[in-house]
């Protein structure tokens, strides 16, 4: 698709000044490139969002993620109204809806921001074709990435498949500054709104209206304002200590902006600009090292997005072909125990409790539980990948797939065979047992050393109805290594 897909460029002069801004993973008006460019042509810009059943009814949809999405839509609609326009919401196929909507309103054209996911790319091409057939203008922008996939390439002109050289190139490229937010917009006239009735616009639905149940508070309040407030908090209290605190799940040491980035509630340009300002104000090498570490995490996100764009088959299975035939176990009981946090390993079960209760899990714990599923239970990493997508409120195809393939040593930028010992990980990253006690309160009274090493007596476990370990770590890691050598 390249940098931009402009099949019918938008002219500067038009008898039909209305432009529709089709939102997907860009649920904001601040620092929005497509909006800023459209505003140069007209003030009459109306937002559109399609609740797409192909996405909502997919097996990898998480109730918590839909809850966050709906909250972001409400925030976005409020922002449009403050500027004088509106966000139109439909439950419809965008390929069918957008041409009808544009024609009904006499719009000049439709603008949107591009996506790296395979489904989104196919959908966008179909929408563009349908709009072009009706003579409607189209403008698109890469806006969820600092650098689009065609911009960061090896000297041979091919996509990177290893992170470190990607980072070296990516970090040296000039970065675009945030773009201004329009001060005002114009919405539809009463007569135009009356024309919408046959297309059945919706009030933003409740979660239950879409068939989902989620009654827990979300880790991050939906919407632009909450994301910007969290960023401000993180810069003031967490960014300069990020390097030393980010791996300790009991600490509030990460930005927790992953869901906001997933849905484009905040722009990567805004985040990058914030890091530059923090760098200038920092007073120690340690602080600057932390800032650069967080910048590298932003680049990891883009690396996985670029990989998915360039190698869409990643979404279907292992990148490294030998792993297509890996002899996985098929033990459903072990998988259910992992999903439900009943493995008998406190750090694993605490992490899964956090995921199931909040829709979010600390990144260090994501690596620990992924390693356990793959290399202790010897279960197919794709089972875990799907379960994460079914539960994470920040679930992102590229990042989730990239993380799981990294853990399985089957994807891009594989590390040498690495098996996390859950007890060692607990001792290193939850040394006081605070995280375990938070999410497994039934174990709170036991000795910290026993919690971290899992050396709880059978009687202690029975007294709080906590299970025995479902596998022996040392035995299972030997077996995984044996199988790994067969397909390596």
Curated annotation (Swiss-Prot):
Its cofactor is FAD; coenzyme F420-(gamma-Glu)n. DNA binds at residues 246, 425. Binds 1 FAD per subunit. FAD binds at residues 242, 254-258, 394-396. It catalyses: cyclobutadipyrimidine (in DNA) = 2 pyrimidine residues (in DNA). The record marks 328, 381, 404 as: Electron transfer via tryptophanyl radical. GO terms for biological process: DNA repair; response to light stimulus. Gene3D superfamilies: 1.25.40.80, DNA Cyclobutane Dipyrimidine Photolyase, subunit A, domain 3, HUPs. Its EC number is 4.1.99.3. The keyword DNA-binding applies. Residues 17-146 form the Photolyase/cryptochrome alpha/beta domain. Keywords: Chromophore, DNA damage, DNA repair, DNA-binding, FAD, Flavoprotein, Lyase, Nucleotide-binding. Pfam families: DNA_photolyase, FAD_binding_7. Residues 297-304, 363-364 are annotated as: Interaction with DNA. GO terms for molecular function: deoxyribodipyrimidine photo-lyase activity; DNA binding; FAD binding. NCBIfam families: photolyase_8HDF. Monomer. Belongs to the DNA photolyase class-1 family. Involved in repair of UV radiation-induced DNA damage. Exhibits specific, light-dependent repair activity for a cyclobutyl pyrimidine dimer by catalyzing the light-dependent monomerization (300-600 nm) of the dimers (in cis-syn configuration), which are formed between adjacent bases on the same DNA strand upon exposure to ultraviolet radiation. It has been shown that photorepair is more important than excision repair for UV-induced DNA lesions in Synechocystis. Its disruption does not affect circadian rhythm. This is Deoxyribodipyrimidine photo-lyase. It comes from Synechocystis sp. (strain ATCC 27184 / PCC 6803 / Kazusa).
